[in-house]
Structure formats: structure tokens, C-alpha cells
Amino acid sequence: MYSSGIDIVDVLRIKKLHERFGERFLHKIYTKGELEYAFSTKEPYLRLAARFAAKEAAAKALGTGIGKVNFKDIEVVLGTDGPELIFHGYAAKIFQEKGFTGKSLSLSHEKKVAVAICVMWRD
């Protein structure tokens, strides 16, 4: 069985949220590693928007939506073949309880938008 989630995020929305709420916003949503990666690039808000979309897409694929899962329970890391998801806390618990055995993440972005799709499956 497969489960999927998709999300699209306006890059400017992420920048405006950071400007409005400051570091508090960033530290509520992103892990230390995600922030270090994003701000080491020329376009940090593009990277942050892609990770925000990934977290939303993964929460949808888990079947919970982001309301029940903490944003930081879903982490995006750079794997050898592209972005990968690492689940912590409640997200890891739900992934295991639902019997998922694998997950895949794809990110894409342009200047103004970022999109993510997440697929999970059971063997």
C-alpha cells in the first residue's frame, strides 16, 4: 500500500514570516541542520520553503497533517541520492505504527515557489 502527500509553498511567505517573527519562527519549524544548510546557500529562503513543503507533504502522507506532528519531528537531510526524510518523535511513532517500510521525497523549486511530494509504502 502507498500513501502520498504534496505541498507547494510561496518562497516570499517564508521570508515574510521570518521577518515578522524572527528567529522564533525559524527555530519552531526547522532543525539546526536544516537552518545551517539553508543559510550556507545563496538562496536560503528557497531552501527553507522547500523544507517547509516537505514537512507538510510528509505529514499528509503520514495521514496526520501537520497539526498533530511537530514540524521538527520531520527533518530533511541531504542524502547521497538527493533529499531524504528523517522522522523523530511522534512522526517516527506514526510511521512505525502504520507499518510503513519505506519513504521517498522529491523537492523542486523555482524563484517564487517550492514544491515537495512524499510517498510512503509498506512491503
Swiss-Prot record:
Gene Ontology terms: biological process: fatty acid biosynthetic process
GO MF term set: holo-[acyl-carrier-protein] synthase activity; magnesium ion binding
Signal peptide: none
Chief place where the protein resides: cytoplasm
Keyword Lipid biosynthesis recorded: yes
Required cofactor names: Mg(2+)
Matches recorded under SUPFAM superfamilies: 4'-phosphopantetheinyl transferase (SSF56214)
InterPro entries: 4-PPantetheinyl_Trfase_dom, 4-PPantetheinyl_Trfase_dom_sf, ACPS, Ppantetheine-prot_Trfase_dom
UniProt KW Lipid metabolism keyword: yes
One Gene Ontology CC term in the entry: cytoplasm
Subcellular location: Cytoplasm
Pfam families noted in UniProt: ACPS
Disulfide feature: none
UniProtKB keywords: Cytoplasm, Fatty acid biosynthesis, Fatty acid metabolism, Lipid biosynthesis, Lipid metabolism, Magnesium, Metal-binding, Transferase
Catalysed reaction, written as an equation: apo-[ACP] + CoA = holo-[ACP] + adenosine 3',5'-bisphosphate + H(+)
Binding site for Mg(2+): 7, 56
EC code: 2.7.8.7
Family indicated by similarity: Belongs to the P-Pant transferase superfamily. AcpS family.
Described purpose of this protein according to its UniProt entry: Transfers the 4'-phosphopantetheine moiety from coenzyme A to a Ser of acyl-carrier-protein.
NCBIfam families xref list: acpS (TIGR00516), pantethn_trn (TIGR00556)
UniProt name for this protein: Holo-[acyl-carrier-protein] synthase
Organism: Carboxydothermus hydrogenoformans (strain ATCC BAA-161 / DSM 6008 / Z-2901)
